[in-house]
A protein has these predicted regions:
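Aromatic-anchored glycine-rich loop motif in surface-exposed flexible loops
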Residues: 1-30
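Alpha-helical solenoid scaffolds that mediate protein-protein interactions
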Residues: 19, 26, 64, 70-72
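Elongated scaffold/linker segments in the mid-to-C-terminal portions of large proteins
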Residues: 70-215
């Protein structure tokens, strides 16, 4: 049988208390690939939310924010066609792939190939209208305000007053206009906006923990 909520809570809290105590011995996070003290605080904030200890959750979320050393991503950060959601420096904790990573060498079995619609390689992409696309539905899209820049990370329907807010990778802009359906994600960009070379474009980063989660 599964353990109780209380048992699991105590187990996780003990682990995180030890992490908070000993993580000072980790002097190199490998460019945020390994967690920092701020990440431990963030995990504790999540734990206390799960246990409905909201005062503690707030306390540790604030500690995470103060220790993070990063600010919430701006509109320019999020919509950049070269750095949009592929820059580990913007997050508290992430994974960084390089051209030497096994996942990148496969050409297709990697984050960008699965998540980025703006490539001509991988499982999603703009090679044709038959390709699968990561997207949201109209209901979710319509719930976002037209002044909320997060909405600009999804392709606006034809004739929309905010269509000009969508920023495409220039080398494949025509393909995006031709094949990409409305509400398709523009969020995760290939590295440096390289949409055609999998060895370069897939050498990207993806987030594990963001400071925005703490607000």
């Amino acid at each position: 049988p599964r353990v109780s909520h209380e048992e699991m809570y105590k187990f996780i809290e003990e682990d995180l208390n030890n992490a908070e105590k000993y993580i000072v011995n980790l002097t190199d996070t490998k460019g945020k690939v390994l967690p920092s003290l701020g990440c431990v605080y963030g995990l504790k904030a999540r734990l206390y939310m799960w246990n409905e200890e909201y005062a503690k959750a707030e306390e540790y979320a604030r500690k995470a924010i103060n220790a993070a050393g990063v600010s919430p991503m701006t509109e320019a950060d999020c919509t950049s066609y070269t750095k949009g959601f592929n820059d580990i420096s913007k997050w508290m904790w992430g994974e960084q792939l390089t051209s030497e990573s096994d996942q990148v060498k496969t050409g297709i079995v990697n984050w960008v190939s699965w998540l980025s619609n703006q490539t001509t390689f991988g499982y999603t992409g703009v090679n044709s209208s038959d390709m699968p696309f990561n997207m949201i539905d109209r209901s979710m899209y319509d719930r976002m305000s037209d002044t909320d820049f997060r909405k600009y990370m999804y392709k606006a329907p034809e004739g929309s007053s905010i269509a000009s807010k969508n920023i495409y990778i220039p080398s494949i802009k025509d393909l995006c206009n031709k094949y990409m359906p409305s509400y398709a994600s523009l969020k995760f960009r290939p590295a440096n906006g390289n949409a055609t070379d999998s060895q370069a474009g897939a050498a990207s980063a993806y987030p594990v923990m963001r400071v925005e989660e703490m607000y």
